[in-house]
Amino acid sequence: MSKIGKLPVAIPAGVTASLDGQTVKVKGPKGALEVTLVEEIAAKIEGSELKVSMNGETTRHKAMWGMSRTLVANLVEGVTKGFEKKLEITGVGYKAAVQGKNLNLSLGYSHDVIYAIPEGIQIVTPKPTEVVISGIDRQKVGQVAAEIREFRGPEPYKGKGVKYAGEFIFRKEGKKK
């Protein structure tokens, strides 16, 4: 039995959830999201809770059960609180700035990297070396953070580059004479 899958998803006040076949739709103060569940999983709304259950007992059913419940829980959390990822930029002359619908990154290349901010995502730069990505869709927020980090990932010798806030970078020792 899945420890995560058997837990019901609480639907707080101000949030409405509806089922349309295999699609779960959630509306809240921050917006609306939906997810389509796989055929192996069934969902039902009981009062102010949404329960996810399996349609069988195979290994695939069990694997999809916990994941589906977490996807639904992320929808509810997204429309109530939202999600946020912070990136830190380390390096001499490395900086970021938001210009209209673009994020302008100076990462030591001969040119600035210009990243178009997708719909549903907000990016702010409280400091030139800090980027805060927020939105209601957890997958999209993580994907945008990963794409920005990929432009210049942290290198192991000096630690220069773009990294997640709180991420540990394994440091290497340089050559010895």
From Swiss-Prot:
A GO BP entry: cytoplasmic translation
Gene Ontology molecular function: any one: rRNA binding
One Gene Ontology term, aspect cellular component: cytosolic large ribosomal subunit
Pfam families (UniProt xref): Ribosomal_L6 (PF00347)
PROSITE patterns in the record: RIBOSOMAL_L6_1
Keywords: Ribonucleoprotein, Ribosomal protein, RNA-binding, rRNA-binding
Keyword Ribonucleoprotein carried by entry: yes
Function as written in the Swiss-Prot or TrEMBL entry: This protein binds to the 23S rRNA, and is important in its secondary structure. It is located near the subunit interface in the base of the L7/L12 stalk, and near the tRNA binding site of the peptidyltransferase center.
Self-association and partners: Part of the 50S ribosomal subunit.
Family: Belongs to the universal ribosomal protein uL6 family.
Protein name: Large ribosomal subunit protein uL6
Gene: rplF
